[in-house]
UniProtKB/Swiss-Prot annotation:
Function: Catalyzes the final step in the synthesis of long-chain linear esters (waxes).
Keyword Metal-binding: no
Species the sequence originates in: Arabidopsis thaliana (Mouse-ear cress)
Membrane topology (UniProt): Multi-pass membrane protein
UniProt catalytic activity: a long chain fatty alcohol + a fatty acyl-CoA = a wax ester + CoA
Compartments it resides in: Membrane
Molecular-function GO term, any one: long-chain-alcohol O-fatty-acyltransferase activity
Its EC number(s): 2.3.1.75
Top-level division of the source organism's lineage: Eukaryota
Endpoints of the signal sequence: none
Any one cellular-component term (Gene Ontology): thylakoid
UniProt KW keywords: Acyltransferase, Lipid biosynthesis, Lipid metabolism, Membrane, Transferase, Transmembrane, Transmembrane helix
Name of the gene: AT6
Protein name: Probable long-chain-alcohol O-fatty-acyltransferase 6
One of the Pfam families matching this protein, by short name: MBOAT_2
Length: 346
């Protein structure tokens, strides 16, 4: 564990140095091709380093933050696009915006504004730490379907809690408002609402800038088929990216199940958008929000169990995530008891 922590620190020091190089050198290069070539060594480094970790939390964090987000951000930056362009006002801002899944909130977006009180986040932390993780102690008594539901809840809560805490700390450090990463995805009323406005919003924005927009701008007069293809291609790229993420975590040959999950969702979302744009059925016979939420979340859950979950379950990833979470909680509890003992003895 100590060696893993040392490696984790070394990687982040290397990442900061690499991003600092991009901050000072890349903007001074005039042509897009040379700027792109200047950031490629950093991108290659970020794509390689997740392989050197043994714990799934370390591998996932580095793969998600650096391989999955920092790489496309830097490529877009070299092309004078994306969240790093125009150049942030100083180096700390550039490093944070490049290395963390955050984005400066320039204008409040009503679609992404979370109107829920802060106690809702505290409730999620309680559910995750006090209920969900403890329920795994009794998993031998739980049905397979119930356990799959717990796994889905685990992925969502751990992602939202960790990313919200990072956003909070970076926001305080930089003294600026940041956009939310999640917007209560369980309230989504359609696939477009789920993927476009509620789930992992930083990733959605990067995919929009890196894949969807270039395809739509490729032709001067875009048609509905171009829109359909752009949506489908965006989900296909997301599927391949998740397949690479699974490789980092499992070190096993890809099975492409998770890619088919995103291919299916890309096709369904593209069809949904086309149906809403070309027909007036939705306006004439609107679906009750409660029903549409149930159908949307149900579709995501069922297809997730079918195509998204088999790989992590087959390779024991969820078991490793759970064991590491329980170990970390036990570690911090022991440290807390030691500190409390020191204070009470004074």
């Amino acid at each position: 564990m100590e060696e893993e922590l040392k490696l984790f620190i070394q990687v982040w020091v290397s990442a900061i140095i690499s991003v600092t190089y991009c901050y000072y050198l890349t903007p001074k290069i005039k042509t897009s091709l040379l700027r792109l070539l200047s950031v490629l060594p950093v991108c290659v480094l970020f794509l390689i380093i997740p392989i050197f970790f043994s714990t799934v939390h370390s591998s996932f964090t580095i793969a998600f933050f650096l391989s999955g987000l920092a790489v496309p951000k830097l490529i877009l930056f070299a092309l004078e696009k994306g969240p790093l362009f125009p150049l942030p006002p100083n180096l700390p801002h550039f490093v944070c915006f490049a290395c963390f899944p955050i984005k400066l909130q320039k204008k409040p977006n009503p679609e992404n504004t979370n109107h829920f009180p802060k106690w809702v986040f505290a409730l999620k932390v309680f559910i995750f730490g006090a209920l969900l993780l403890q329920a795994y102690h009794y998993k031998q008594f739980l049905s397979t379907n119930f356990l799959l539901g717990l796994y889905a809840l685990h992925i969502y809560l751990e992602l939202e809690i960790s990313l919200t805490l990072i956003k909070f700390l970076v926001s305080i450090t930089l003294g600026c408002d940041l956009e939310p990463q999640f917007n209560e995805p369980y309230l989504a009323t359609s696939l477009h609402d789920f993927w476009g406005h509620r789930w992992n919003l930083m990733v959605s924005k990067i995919l929009w800038l890196a894949v969807y927009n270039p395809i739509r701008q490729w032709r001067a007069k875009s048609s509905e088929w171009d829109r359909f293809f752009a949506i489908f291609a965006t989900f296909l790229v997301s599927g391949v990216a998740h397949e690479i993420l699974y490789f980092y975590l499992t070190r096993e040959k890809p099975t492409w199940e998770v890619t088919w999950f995103f291919v299916l969702h890309g096709f369904c979302m593209a069809a949904e958008v086309a149906l809403k744009r070309k027909t007036k059925l939705v306006q004439r016979w609107p679906v009750n929000p409660a029903v549409s939420r149930l159908l949307t979340v149900g579709f995501v859950f069922v297809t997730g169990v079918w195509l998204f979950s088999p790989q992590p379950i087959r390779h024991g990833l969820m078991e490793r995530f759970i064991n590491e979470d329980l170990f970390l909680i036990d570690f911090f509890n022991r440290k807390l008891y030691i500190l409390l003992g020191l204070f009470t003895s004074l």
